[in-house]
Amino acid sequence: MTDREEVVELRGHIIDSLIFSRVLDTIMEMGGDFEILEFKVGKRKTDPSFAKILVKGKDPEHLREIVSELRKYGAVPVHTQEVRLEPAPADGVCPRGFYTTTNHRTFVLFDGEWIEVEDIEMDCAIVVYPEERRAVAKPIREVREGELVVVGDRGVRVKPPERPRGRTGIFGFMESEVSPEKPTPTLIRRIAEELEWHRKNGKIVVVVGPAVIHAGARDDLAWMIREGYVDVLFAGNAVATHDVEASLFGTSLGVDLETGEPVKGGHSHHLYAINEIRRVGGLREAVEKGILKDGIMYECIVNDVPYVLAGSIRDDGPIPDVITDVMEAQAEMRRHLKGATLVLMMATMLHSIATGNLLPSWVKTICVDINPAVVTKLMDRGTAQALGIVSDVGVFLPELVKELKRVRDDEA
């Protein structure tokens, strides 16, 4: 074998998850060549498959580029060396050439042992703590001077998601594609069943934009919070503002939520709502004083559902609960996403993509938006596990709540 050739191995459900074909396609697309040295197909549904492939490049550097790309699919060189570690030169600075993570399960070979990287998310560095035999994914800004950072991709193994073997629900039904479908009863029923399962067995994070209120689905989301289908809520200043506006004035953006007609002087209602919350000190104080008596934020507070309101450069006010430091908001989102098993994103491109960037690839994700480009952007930016449903949230959410009630009645 020459310095232009290297043998890599693939293990797992590499056929029906299309990993094997993607590896071969990548080699050819990058101008390389390959030879399949060994290929064993699992005979039963639970049996993994195995492939050993000789990868050929035009020169050593070209080979290195190909093998580096193949690592994203879980390919590991047969003669794997241990990770190369270098100390961070300063707080918030990594060594040059540091390894940048994907959002897939990742392992590093250290002291003869494959160690799984904790807190994995895309676009981070990997810090190894030798005495604790731990490896942790960290954003660049959180790396401290002297910490040992993985440099290059030597000794790194990535395990991309495989096609689910057991219960798949809506995720098996939709096969991870952006769906142009309207929310049919069958589709929404499957989503409701998924939510019910995660309500009992997991942790549901819901990410929403203000269209939930504008489109008249505020009461439906409030019901979901009250009934335990929301463990954490992510939103921005606008959601809280228009939710309070709806509670105090019955309007959203100055439009009567019952009649759909603009209200005289309604253009000021959201500012009056912000001012009222600022006057008493915050949303919780407004609930305690009996000012805020219903709605999304009310249900979060009375049901002890944590929320993260992340600020934007265009915000009015903002409401005191809003985190205006974006790095602090991101850190809070990251903290609350730990242990999440299902994320439901509705009618917000900004917060959906921000949340998606923090998620491991095995967390089930549903994105609902009237604009198909939002779902496409979310997936293009790395959240490839997202299931997209193109729908008006004002239609989708009320139907989802109806199906959730039916699911609960059926199980009663």
From Swiss-Prot:
<keyword id="KW-0520">NAD</keyword>
<comment type="similarity">
    <text>Belongs to the AgrE/ArgZ ornithine cyclodeaminase family.</text>
</comment>
<dbReference type="InterPro" id="IPR029035">
    <property type="entry name" value="DHS-like_NAD/FAD-binding_dom"/>
</dbReference>
<feature type="binding site">
    <location>
        <position position="350"/>
    </location>
    <ligand>
        <name>NAD(+)</name>
    </ligand>
</feature>
<feature type="binding site">
    <location>
        <position position="351"/>
    </location>
    <ligand>
        <name>NAD(+)</name>
    </ligand>
</feature>
<feature type="binding site">
    <location>
        <position position="348"/>
    </location>
    <ligand>
        <name>NAD(+)</name>
    </ligand>
</feature>
<dbReference type="InterPro" id="IPR007545">
    <property type="entry name" value="LOR/SDH_bifunc_enz_cons_dom"/>
</dbReference>
<feature type="binding site">
    <location>
        <position position="393"/>
    </location>
    <ligand>
        <name>NAD(+)</name>
    </ligand>
</feature>
<dbReference type="Pfam" id="PF21571">
    <property type="entry name" value="ArgZ-like_C_1st"/>
</dbReference>
<dbReference type="Pfam" id="PF04455">
    <property type="entry name" value="Saccharop_dh_N"/>
</dbReference>
<keyword id="KW-0547">Nucleotide-binding</keyword>
<dbReference type="InterPro" id="IPR048963">
    <property type="entry name" value="ArgZ/ArgE-like_C_2nd"/>
</dbReference>
<feature type="binding site">
    <location>
        <position position="349"/>
    </location>
    <ligand>
        <name>NAD(+)</name>
    </ligand>
</feature>
<dbReference type="Pfam" id="PF21570">
    <property type="entry name" value="ArgZ-like_C_2nd"/>
</dbReference>
<dbReference type="InterPro" id="IPR048964">
    <property type="entry name" value="ArgZ/ArgE-like_C_1st"/>
</dbReference>
<feature type="binding site">
    <location>
        <position position="316"/>
    </location>
    <ligand>
        <name>NAD(+)</name>
    </ligand>
</feature>
<protein>
    <recommendedName>
        <fullName>Ornithine cyclodeaminase</fullName>
        <ecNumber>4.3.1.12</ecNumber>
    </recommendedName>
</protein>
<feature type="binding site">
    <location>
        <position position="369"/>
    </location>
    <ligand>
        <name>NAD(+)</name>
    </ligand>
</feature>
<dbReference type="InterPro" id="IPR005239">
    <property type="entry name" value="ArgZ/ArgE-like"/>
</dbReference>
<comment type="function">
    <text>Catalyzes the conversion of ornithine to proline, with the release of ammonia.</text>
</comment>
<feature type="binding site">
    <location>
        <position position="237"/>
    </location>
    <ligand>
        <name>NAD(+)</name>
    </ligand>
</feature>
<keyword id="KW-0456">Lyase</keyword>
<feature type="binding site">
    <location>
        <position position="392"/>
    </location>
    <ligand>
        <name>NAD(+)</name>
    </ligand>
</feature>
<feature type="binding site">
    <location>
        <position position="238"/>
    </location>
    <ligand>
        <name>NAD(+)</name>
    </ligand>
</feature>
